[in-house]
Amino acid sequence: MTIIRKKHPLIKIINHSFIDLPAPSNISSWWNFGSLLGLCLAIQILTGLFLAMHYTSDTATAFSSVAHICRDVNYGWLIRYMHANGASMFFICLFLHVGRGVYYGSYNMIETWNMGIILLFAVMATAFMGYVLPWGQMSFWGATVITNLLSAIPYIGTTLVEWIWGGFSVDKATLTRFFAFHFILPFIITALVLVHLLFLHETGSNNPTGLNSDADKIPFHPYYTVKDFLGVLVLLMAFMILTLFFPDILGDPDNYTPANPLNTPPHIKPEWYFLFAYAILRSIPNKLGGVLALILSILILAFMPLLHTSKQRALTFRPITQTMYWVLVADLLVLTWIGGQPVEYPFIIIGQTASIAYFTIIMILMPIAGMIENNILDLN
């Protein structure tokens, strides 16, 4: 078996990635989320495939086809709710994975980090288009509002929006193409994940100290396969509790009303995992400015290696930047809350304050804190 594992052209790739891979001996449970994201992707592709067998991407029948899946297909309700809540679990793992990367300075592995940012954008695009497919009120109006933001692009904006819509409003053509893209993107994401892993295995994993761990490596199997399996069990437990006991808790009641272009819902808002970005978008009165802030709220991650001023990689031994980091986490929670609130006093001013704080902490306060720590520890 050992000979096949190490010699066979295909199996040796798996061997070098998941079995004989040298891994740092001290990586904590924060390093579990990569494998959990892989599991989430697999769940989403499988449940999505079975949903696609019964779904029709036509404005006249889309809403009914989802109802049909839930009522008439064997375990269709389970597949549908696993897919909907699987997206939420996916984003929880994504945010924790990115948060881990920021905390421990993993962004210094630039190729892996940039690939991760591309993956984040791809997953967000996929989730957005998936939300449109049930063709409920929030699906329709969410699609209208978000695609309409592109009209803020000077000169080509309006033409671009109509081109994406396939007409003069969100309609049959839009739904069909969104279904096509929603179906193909997860497979593109899977390919990008392999590239992400390829880049990661060029440098090896980071670890909680942020120090070089070449002198102390252990094989991935059995140590981290077992450790990852515990994470899998915890995730599946949480996932099943969410899906079987509270399937609609993260959804919007408006999406149980069929799409009606003549009736606008009182509060148009995206799924919970986009609310922080939506709050940043709404906090700027100018349309183009809002769109740029929205994109920059994610794209700012790409500038993290440039904003790293400390002589140490991780935040493990850096209490000042640690404080900044947790304030940033709290700020993101505030933004998420504000994104779901109506546009009125006092929510407008809270959202604007939180948006300014978000960019200030990342671009100004954390780099300054890094320099202060260098001076305190006399690392200059």
Curated annotation (Swiss-Prot):
Cellular compartments annotated: Mitochondrion inner membrane
InterPro entries recorded: Cyt_b/b6_C, Cyt_b/b6_C_sf, Cyt_b/b6_N, Cytb/b6-like_sf, Cytochrome_b, Cytochrome_b_C_euk/bac, Cytochrome_b_N_euk/bac, Di-haem_cyt_TM
Transmembrane segments: 33-53, 77-98, 113-133, 178-198, 226-246, 288-308, 320-340, 347-367
Chief subcellular location: mitochondrion
An example Gene Ontology molecular-function term: metal ion binding
Keywords: Electron transport, Heme, Iron, Membrane, Metal-binding, Mitochondrion, Mitochondrion inner membrane, Respiratory chain, Transmembrane, Transmembrane helix, Transport, Ubiquinone
Cofactor entry: heme b
Pfam families (alphabetical): Cytochrom_B_C (PF00032), Cytochrome_B (PF00033)
Any GO BP annotation: mitochondrial electron transport, ubiquinol to cytochrome c
Residues that, per the record, bind heme b b562: H83, H182
Binding site for a ubiquinone: H201
One GO cellular component, as annotated: respiratory chain complex III
Membrane topology qualifier: Multi-pass membrane protein
Cofactor note (record): Binds 2 heme b groups non-covalently.
Keyword Repeat recorded: no
Gene3D superfamilies tied to this protein: Cytochrome Bc1 Complex, Chain C (1.20.810.10)
Family from the record: Belongs to the cytochrome b family.
Miscellaneous comment: Heme 1 (or BL or b562) is low-potential and absorbs at about 562 nm, and heme 2 (or BH or b566) is high-potential and absorbs at about 566 nm.
Protein name: Cytochrome b
Source organism of the structure: Microtus gerbei
Upper taxonomic lineage: Eukaryota, Metazoa, Chordata, Craniata, Vertebrata
